[in-house]
A protein has these predicted regions:
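Helix-loop-helix "sensor" segment of P-loop NTPases
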Residues: 22-26, 105, 114-166, 180-195, ...
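Conserved P-loop NTPase "ATPase switch" module shared by AAA+ and STAND
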Residues: 66-92, 107-112
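Short capping/hinge segments at domain boundaries that bridge a core fold to an adjacent linker or tail
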Residues: 45-47, 194-199, 222-229, 239-287, ...
Length: 851
């Protein structure tokens, strides 16, 4: 409905105008009585120009000015009148009489508003005697067709989407933007905003509007869709008059039928309007919104989109920041900072926003300043922010001090959690009910109190009570916990407790709900995802664990020390389970740094234990020993609570296995057996530990081993269960037992077995003979290099043997281990080489000394 004057490609027409032009072209002298309605910029003038051209080419006279009253009009002349809504009633009545005679050919174009009674009568008459046509915005396809006529632009989807989104398909605006883009860099990704020259073209359209319309446009640009009552107060008009203003603005093609501005019009309104007027409208809108209890965040977001945030009043910025705090803490921090730059004093809410967003540097800097200079209420909130940030960075002792100083109910509970985490049993008594400051107990305070109860029960009560309290605390925060500032979330502590109890499904569910509810904001989201990755790793789902770990750092921010420790332990744990010795060596330095950066506490014993096994595998356990001593001392101060000590003992056992220290392994087994009555998980781990050392001493009871392995699998330690069965299989001299245990190992890995277990000894020709003890040293070397991804030729070069010899070694291992295919062989080899220390492979341990 507008000429593409850039490429002389004619018009982009909707069906109605196209049919009209076709009819006129076929019979220029035929009857013609048409009313064309459409907002400004929708192509009325372009269509009339094309109608004039068609008639003139046919030799028919064209008149484009409405006749005066009493002026004669030649019936052979086509009358084409534009902007009929601007005519006075006298001229409209002249046109009405021309229609009534039915001797004249007439086309009248007008906007939908203003519409006098005379114009309405004329439009009705044109509809009765001919047709009425409404011009609408381009569809996306029509926008694409228009751009296709511009050689510099073509029909690229990204440009079509950009132009159509910016203009809403208004033909005038499409033409302006296309013309402006034709002379600029339009490579993919280069076009982000309309060129300034295009935006400037809207200046005359805005300047001719009444002041009230200009204020209305500014209000809609800033606040989106606003109620009529609010607009009326802004422009000092009654509701009926506001409706007229809205209709006038729509008729000008500046406001869409949905009451919204297109992006390019919003940018023009905001950037071309006088700053003083824009500020006045923004302030007034803010006053009206705040007075009616409305939100101001959409107002501020609109101003930010066009780069006018600096014009926003401080009260608006702080109100919007408070609204954004729960869902967009980073944006809230930005708004608080803008308010501070405009002269508003920094407050604890600004530090809170920075902390929730995960920007602990800014949070600590602001909180420290407020602790020294702010009024008591802000100082208390600043202390909580600083305490939380310090907890995330491992300074739990200082965090506890600040929480105690803050003195609120939540802070007191978090101080209890932190004290227990550092081994302080002096706070294990139940805290007094209620808030010390006299404030009512909030859901946040109740959750904090339950969290403290759960952590207390984890060291001095039954594990079921601890887990129940922590899961309940997590549930309290799920409906509205996005703005809850937490040193550690109840969900994370519940998941840790569940992992220590072997209840991995409970851990997964509570973490999933916490992430879905955004509990603790972005600050805690990383913690929750890391624990999800930990659970996947423990189960042996190493690929999924790696993928989940990758999501933790997608935002590009560095991990805080506690999260860094867990991330390092997950990477090392995945590498160990994949038998990737190269990755273990590459990651060891970073893992040690992570341990050094975070002091040992109760909630980091899990990664410390995993790193101890990795250190033992690398022959470098001594560098971790001081931290392991600290961990054992912490547990001793707490009375060696089985819930926390059992997993560390389990890790210690495997470290002792890798370093070939039978006496140390026996100590861990003894401790695990002593704790076996504490929980089902402790009993399973104790039985597995006892079975494992028996296997290493060459005493393989396939029934006991399989029961222990399946017990580990059922408590979530799937990879460990498969490993125990595999280790026993290669150490037994009984061919039938070996087959049974290999089948068990395959089943526990979640992979299909190589076939049904043979029923008799005669059918076990593929199983190792009774004199064979596991894999030979050379086979272990080949297995490790195969698992590292080397080719047979590369392995041969490394071991100074031929590639053919390597192939024979692999074939013998596959036959000996009764694997149906290479995939099964690789999976089983991972369980067999994981515990192999370079100097002790395949050597049975001495029998335990009888005391």
């Amino acid at each position: 409905m507008i000429m593409n004057d850039i490429a002389e490609s004619g018009l982009t027409l909707d069906r109605g105008p196209r049919v009209l032009l076709d009819a006129v072209g076929q019979d220029p002298a035929g009857p013609l009585s048409v009313g064309i309605a459409g907002p400004g910029g929708h192509g009325k003038t372009a269509l009339l120009t094309e109608l004039a051209r068609v008639h003139q080419r046919a030799g028919i006279a064209v008149r484009t000015i409405a006749p005066q009253p009493g002026e004669a009009v030649d019936p052979d002349t086509v009358v084409l009148v534009d902007d009929a809504h601007l005519l006075d009633d006298a001229r409209v009545e002249v046109l009405l009489r021309l229609v009534a005679t039915r001797r004249h050919r007439l086309v009248v174009a007008h906007r939908p508003w203003p519409r006098s009674a005379a114009l309405s009568e004329l439009v009705d008459a044109l509809r009765r005697d001919g047709q009425a046509m409404l011009l609408t915005p381009f569809t996306r396809e029509q926008t694409a067709a228009y751009l296709a006529g511009t050689p510099e632009l073509g029909r690229r989807d990204d440009l079509v989407d950009f132009v159509h989104t910016q203009t809403g398909g208004v033909p005038r605006d499409v033409e302006r933007l296309a013309r402006g883009l034709a002379g600029t860099d339009t490579r993919t990704g280069a076009v982000v905003n309309p060129p300034r020259s295009v935006v400037a073209e809207f200046g005359p359209d805005l300047d001719v509007q009444p002041t009230a319309v200009q204020r209305l446009l500014l209000a809609v640009a800033a606040g989106g869709t606003l109620p009529v009552s609010m607009l009326g107060a802004l422009v000092d008009r009654e509701p009926a008059a506001v409706d007229d203003l809205i209709a006038t603005t729509r008729a000008a093609g500046l406001l869409g039928a949905d009451g919204r501005l297109t992006p390019i019009v919003r940018r023009a309104v905001t950037t071309l309007s006088p700053t003083t007027e824009r500020n006045a409208v923004c302030r007034r809108l803010t006053e009206l919104q705040l007075a009616r209890g409305g939100v101001v965040l959409p107002l501020v977001r609109s101003l930010l989109a066009v780069g006018a945030l600096s014009d926003c009043p401080v009260t608006t910025l702080t109100a919007a920041a408070n609204e954004a705090l729960a869902d967009e803490p980073a944006f809230a921090a930005e708004l608080f900072a803008a308010a501070t730059a405009a002269g508003h004093p920094a407050g604890a809410k600004q530090a809170l926003a920075a902390a929730l967003a995960g920007n602990l540097d800014d949070a600590l800097r602001l909180a420290d300043r407020l602790l020294a200079t702010a009024a008591p209420p802000d100082r208390r909130e600043a202390a909580v922010v600083a305490a939380t940030a310090l907890a995330h960075r491992g300074h739990v002792g200082r965090s506890v001090e600040l929480y105690r100083w803050a003195g609120t109910a939540s802070a007191t509970s978090f101080a209890t959690v932190g004290a227990i985490a550092t081994g302080d049993l002096g706070v294990t008594a139940e805290p007094p009910p209620g808030d010390p400051t006299g404030e009512p107990s909030t859901m946040h305070a109740s959750a904090a109190r339950l969290t403290a109860t759960g952590v207390r029960d984890s060291v001095s009560g039954p594990p079921t009570a601890a887990l129940s309290a922590l899961v309940q605390a997590a549930a309290l925060l799920e409906p509205d916990g996005r703005a809850a500032l937490l040193p550690d979330s109840p969900a994370a502590l519940a998941a840790l407790t569940a992992v220590h109890c072997g209840e991995l499904e409970i851990a997964e569910r509570v973490l999933h709900r916490a992430l879905a509810g955004g509990v603790g904001g972005p600050l805690m989201a990383r913690r929750h995802r890391l624990l999800q990755a930990w659970i996947l790793m423990v189960r042996g789902e190493t690929h999924a664990a790696t993928e989940r770990l990758a999501t933790v750092t997608l935002d590009g921010r560095q991990l805080e020390s506690r999260d860094l420790l867990f991330a390092a332990a997950i990477r090392m744990g995945v590498s160990r389970r994949n038998s990737d010795l190269g990755a273990l060596k590459r990651g060891w330095g970073q893992a040690l740094e992570a341990v050094v950066r975070h002091p040992v506490d109760l909630f980091t014993l899990l990664p410390l234990g995993e790193l101890a096994i990795a250190g033992a595998r690398l022959g470098d356990l001594a560098r971790l020993e001081p931290y392991l001593i600290q961990g054992r001392a912490l547990l001793s101060r707490l009375g060696d609570p089985p819930l926390w000590s059992v997993p560390l003992r389990w890790s210690g056992l495997h470290a002792a296995i890798l370093t070939a220290e039978p006496a140390t392994a026996d100590e861990h087994v003894t401790a695990l057996l002593a704790a076996a009555d504490h929980s089902r998980y402790a009993a399973v781990v104790a039985a597995a530990a006892q079975s494992w050392v028996e296997v290493l001493r060459g005493d393989v009871d396939p029934i006991r081993v399989e029961a222990a392995a399946r017990g580990l699998h059922d408590t979530g330690l799937c990879w460990d269960g498969a490993r125990l069965a595999g280790q026993a299989a290669i150490r037994t001299a009984d061919r039938r037992a070996m087959t049974t245990l290999l089948e068990c190992a395959r089943a526990l890995q979640g992979r299909p077995s190589g076939g049904p277990a043979p029923a008799t000894g005669a059918s076990t020709t593929r199983v190792a003979g009774p004199t064979q003890q596991g894999l030979s040293d050379r086979e272990y070397e080949v297995a490790e290099l195969v698992l590292a991804g080397l080719t047979y030729r590369e392995i041969g070069d490394r071991l100074f043997i031929s590639a053919k010899t390597v192939e024979h070694h692999v074939a013998r291992m596959r036959n000996r281990l009764n694997c149906a295919n290479r995939t099964e062989l690789l999976a089983l080899l991972r369980t067999l080489v994981a515990d192999r220390a370079s100097d002790t492979a395949g050597q049975p341990w001495p029998q335990r000394a009888v005391r």
